[in-house]
């Protein structure tokens, strides 16, 4: 694989659903580990009842109102971290949750679930508000991989379940052929 280069901030500063779908097949690089993003979910603004910013700006959600291309990491159930990327224009709270990845380096490993991927990668609350653009240790890179995906309702939430804002890879043939991953 060629040297990974972070995608530009403009990549994240767009419609959240566009970003969520285009993150599928991108490489997530974190402190020496590389994983292909295989599942995402969108959380969009104050009219989305499942979005953390639905009730307005708080200390916790402040990062969602900031510029795009930053990490938003939080704890759920008192034990699992979740990784999100801030999207859209500054002042509009939105983010993409990274729900699943396929690790390609240093080993071959499929991780389904935001808690599993954060635990494996070592992502925790100290990685909240990281700039993903000007960062050599934590970023998203485009490796030119296109993977087919399906659109479904978001999972693990109780509000906004009618939104078809979950995107999950349906066929990893390209991933297998290019990176010799095991299904």
Swiss-Prot record:
Disulfide bonds: none annotated. It comes from the Bacteria. The keyword Membrane does not apply. CDD domains: AAG. It is an enzyme of class 3 (hydrolase). GO terms for molecular function: alkylbase DNA N-glycosylase activity; DNA binding. Its EC number is 3.2.2.-. Keywords: DNA damage, DNA repair, Hydrolase. InterPro entries: Formyl_transferase-like_C_sf, MPG, MPG_sf. One of its GO terms (biological process) is base-excision repair. Pfam families: Pur_DNA_glyco (PF02245). The keyword DNA repair applies. Belongs to the DNA glycosylase MPG family. NCBIfam families: 3mg (TIGR00567), PRK00802.1-4 (NF002004). HAMAP family: 3MGH. This is Putative 3-methyladenine DNA glycosylase.
